[in-house]
């Protein structure tokens, strides 16, 4: 029998939602509430394929959830509030405490709060959503799905930094990795598309959007990933630097008189594609500029692709080979150019890809871009974190 599950992503002043029919994984409706706690909050919901937008003051997340549930009934999306049997909440950081999704109790809520020091911008906001739903829908399971959980299978040699060991023991300083829900979804989907058990596959998953991370997935388990203690580490991103020499931070402070916080702000919000190009963090803008002859925009694209290319080689070495390379997220799904740059020269690894197939796969299309004879398969898979969240609600909420 079908069940309706809500997949939730709560920000400090926003609430993104999808109502999904399970186990069919059919989207019933989706929407966004913005400017919560501010004047003129915006509520957008999809009804019969059309976006319906209203502007009203919404004082907090509890009121936002209340308005959303009322809208479901008003638009005949549900008959009754009891039609919704579970909610799944994206939580950015689960630390070492949560190696998998978990049904939310008061104790779990408290532990998510304690982990806020590892994700001060996100965990408190995620908790606002959790508390609102637990208050208004007290009789159904609520499940926390952590961005970090999928990577908790990494071995020590992958997650430890070469710092004095007590920093790890005392402060939890280690690589955690992010985008776990996306990497988990696309790796499972790749196995389905190949009609092979995931246990038999070595997958390199490239989640490339404004934020980007690469994961080495061996037998369905993450054994390494490019992001680190925070989502700042790894490859070049839209506005984030990715990996740099740590000694640059005091050097920049000394040269510019900036504080550590100001330098961190630069690394997070003024670097990456934006910093390199000097014009934009949006890959589409940079591609146009590069075509019109802007050398810095071309250089930014080259650096961006080069870092991803390097991780693919590194992770192939970590897994003693690779069977599948997956591209997903906004850029991975839609940029023919970046995929081509990333794959260039990988023939030595057994990667043979078809430029025509590559050009045809964008705007939500799924498929292989390798030649049939290629030992390594290359696949574009639109990510669907909400479906993964809904699956985990079914599993960990005891609804199967």
UniProtKB/Swiss-Prot annotation:
The active site is at 147 (proton donor/acceptor). The keyword Nucleotide-binding applies. Gene3D superfamilies: 3.30.420.40. One of its GO terms (molecular function) is magnesium ion binding. Keywords: ATP-binding, Cytoplasm, Kinase, Magnesium, Metal-binding, Nucleotide-binding, Transferase. Pathway: Metabolic intermediate biosynthesis; acetyl-CoA biosynthesis; acetyl-CoA from acetate: step 1/2. InterPro entries: Ac/propionate_kinase, Aliphatic_acid_kin_short-chain, Aliphatic_acid_kinase_CS, ATPase_NBD. It catalyses: acetate + ATP = acetyl phosphate + ADP. The record marks 179, 240 as: Transition state stabilizer. One of its GO terms (biological process) is acetyl-CoA biosynthetic process. Substrate binds at residue 90. This is Acetate kinase. It comes from Staphylococcus aureus (strain Mu3 / ATCC 700698).
């Amino acid at each position: 029998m079908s069940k309706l599950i809500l997949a939730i992503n709560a920000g400090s002043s926003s609430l993104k939602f999808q109502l999904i029919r399970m186990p069919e994984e059919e989207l019933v409706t989706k929407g966004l509430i913005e400017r919560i706690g501010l004047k003129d909050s915006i509520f957008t919901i999809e009804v019969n394929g059309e976006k319906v937008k209203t502007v009203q003051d919404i004082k907090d997340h509890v009121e936002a959830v209340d308005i959303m549930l009322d809208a479901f009934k008003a638009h005949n999306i549900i008959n009754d509030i009891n039609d919704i049997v579970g909610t799944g909440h994206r939580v950015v950081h689960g630390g070492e405490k949560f190696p998998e999704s978990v049904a939310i109790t008061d104790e779990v809520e408290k532990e998510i709060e304690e982990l806020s020091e590892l994700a001060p911008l996100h965990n408190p906001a995620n908790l606002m959503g959790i508390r609102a739903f637990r208050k208004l829908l007290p009789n159904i399971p609520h499940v926390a799905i952590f961005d970090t959980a999928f990577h908790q299978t990494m071995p020590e040699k992958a997650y430890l930094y070469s710092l004095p060991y007590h920093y790890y023991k005392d402060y939890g300083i280690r690589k955690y990795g992010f985008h776990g829900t996306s990497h988990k979804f696309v790796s499972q989907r790749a196995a389905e598309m190949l009609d092979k058990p995931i246990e038999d596959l070595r997958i390199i998953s490239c989640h490339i959007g404004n934020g980007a991370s690469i994961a080495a997935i061996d037998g369905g388990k993450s054994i390494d990933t490019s992001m680190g203690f925070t989502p700042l580490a790894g490859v070049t991103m839209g506005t984030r630097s990715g990996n740099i020499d740590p000694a640059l931070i005091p050097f920049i402070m000394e040269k510019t008189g900036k504080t550590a916080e100001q330098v961190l702000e630069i690394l997070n919000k003024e670097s990456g594609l934006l910093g390199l190009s000097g014009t934009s963090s949006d890959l589409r803008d940079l591609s146009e500029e590069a075509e019109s002859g802007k050398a810095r925009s071309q250089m930014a694209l080259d650096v961006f692709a080069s870092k991803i290319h390097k991780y693919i080689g590194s992770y192939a070495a970590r897994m003693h080979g690779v069977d599948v390379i997956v591209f997903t997220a906004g850029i991975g799904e839609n940029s023919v150019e970046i995929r081509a740059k990333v794959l260039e020269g990988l023939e030595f690894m057994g990667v043979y890809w078809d430029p025509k197939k590559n050009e045809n796969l964008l705007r939500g299309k799924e498929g292989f871009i390798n030649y049939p004879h290629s030992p390594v398969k290359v696949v574009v898979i639109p990510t669907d974190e909400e479906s993964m969240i809904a699956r985990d609600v079914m599993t960990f909420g005891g609804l199967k």
